[in-house]
Amino acid sequence: MTATIDHHDLAATEPLLLPERPARIGPTSRRLLARLVVGLAVWFAVGSVLIAVGSTAWRAFGTSMIFPGAGFLYVAWPVLTLVTLVAVVIALVLWWGVSAHFAIPLVWLASAAGAALLADGPRLVVDRGTTWGWVVPLAYAGAVATLGWMVWRIESAYRRKAAKVPELNEYLRSATLPAPITSRRAPDEMDAELLRWCYDFAFQPEDGLDGLDWGEQFHGGTQLRYQMNSLTWAMSLYAANHLPNAPGHITRALETMVRKHTDLRVWKYWHALNLIGNFDPNPDPIRRDNIMFSAFLGDVINCVEAATGTEVFDQPGSLEFVWSDGRTFSYDHHTLTEAVRRNFERSSLGFFPCEPGWSFTVCNVMGAQALYGHDVVHGTDTWEQVRERWQHTLDHEYLTPDGSYAHIRSNHIGVSWDTGEVPGGHYFANGTHRFADILPAHARRAKALELRGAAPKMGALSSMVHDGRLDLDLPPELERHRTRTSKLLPWVKIIGGARLVGDERLVDAAIRSSAEKCATGERWPNRPLDASASGLGSYMIVRWSAPLDLAGLAMRGFVDPVGPVLADTAWDDVLVTEAVSPDGDSLRLALQPRIDDAAVRITLWFGQLRPGVAYTLAGTGEAHSFVAGDDGAAAVELTVDRTLVLVLAEAVAP
């Protein structure tokens, strides 16, 4: 495995400004939207002809073509008009929720056919065959009003944002970004509890997913895939930042976490989406679309490999997805990455879908990260193969005038709308790396724009820190799936915001206070903090994001540990919470019994020592001396009955 760093764009010093004359819509989206407009124009024209020259039945049909359900009102069935409007709303939800792209046209066509069939039939409260001619101009008025309202909303949002461009560019020219926080915080008891929970979750039977939240798998916060993603990312950060010199146990845990992503319960949702949205019965979760699974898993594996150096998932067939009828779809890190690259190339929009027909910015950022991270750890160039087109799509199809990006866009008709998943349907950056690896200049611009709102808020919170604590009683907030509230979620935002502005004092205070105020005292399968599984994963990510955050880990790739390492011990009996070499010569080690109030006699096997050199292992009432063997290895026996903080160093000559 190789580790490389792409320095492309890293040296740029000029700020990335916003376009002074931004387009209202990108070229590909414009073409898709024009196709929709032509189709609607033909549809309305046919409806108008039927109204003008047709029989009563055809007039009813044509009236519904002008406005869904209006034909029912024309034939004096107002109740069915209301039913149609409700059906249109349901179809709209299904269009977005399960990619039922046919739902709205089907309801529209059904309302027209139904009105025609009832044209000469009985009525509820009026005479048989009654028609209300005034409905025809009302249908046209309704169509014009609806289309006009849509255009007005889009145009007013565009003009409002475009008016900000001169001010924003002036700000960007002089904006300064705070240095990232890179100092490592020593793990405390809550870190130990969180790590213990992660191990307990990972090492349950491989078909076990106890500890996750269960619910629908299409949208919301109960998707198993995203819960697994966040937990694995967090564990990767812990491995890289706190256990680089004791990789054995956490590497096995992370390998198990990746394998759990192949559990059928995690990805079986795709069969229904692919069938409904693509009319494709193939359940393979990697082959086509579904970037919300393939790209996220690719990025997860990147992080695991960068943190631990494992090459397990580079082996052919190391990722096996077994469908309910026994069909097996075999992949590995390389073929998974190739599938993501291939999907980018086949997409006419440049971004490819999560749910069929819907391409989300965040998911496609994750797709770019999946390619970039693979390139770093394997020395390939998959990201550079798609980078230019990908960036063009980002800048010309998704960018809005104020520097934010549309959350979602249709691959079929080019429209973007607010799904309610993110505030306002836009954001300055997204993905776990927020452009830092794939497009550093974009990352700097996004961070500068985010700081305009975040810096004053974080400054006010920072002034409230006393004695290393932030004494706030924050109200619980709804989790993303809206089935429960969490006291931890507001703290995640504060810690993330404090990292954004580079306020280490506020970060430490929020980490300390959040643990004190949100602790439950419970262990797996319950959670040690008041949060959902996704919320817990997000919290661990922001808690463990120094000195390396996820972007830094991706850009660094895997680096062999320097200095002494803890090669092996009784991992089931002892919890190692820290193993780092601050100077390349010594080893700082923290460990405690896996079981509370237990005293365990263990052996610590050390490696990468200097052959024949005398060492001491001391701290927390312990003192051991030994000489490293010719192979640079040594073993020490000791009793662990409490938290021990030890330092292994070369013995000082008397």
Predicted stretch roles:
Residues 191-199, 232, 247-265, 294-305, ...:
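Hydrophobic core segments within long, regular secondary-structure runs in both alpha-
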Residues 199-219, 259-284, 337-358, 395-418, ...:
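Glycine- and aromatic-rich loop/turn segments at beta-sheet edges
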Residues 5-208, 303, 307-311, 425-614, ...:
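Terminal, non-catalytic domain-edge segments
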Residues 618-636:
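Solvent-exposed beta-strand/loop surfaces of large extracellular or lumenal domains
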Residues 223-239, 289-305, 359-375, 416-435, ...:
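Well-ordered alpha-helical segments within folded domains of soluble proteins
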Residues 176-279, 499, 503-506:
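Long, contiguous N-terminal structural blocks used for assembly/anchoring
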Residues 292, 321, 327-331, 335, ...:
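Extended ligand-binding clefts on enzyme/binding-domain cores
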Residues 236-358:
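Extended ligand-binding groove/face enriched in aromatic
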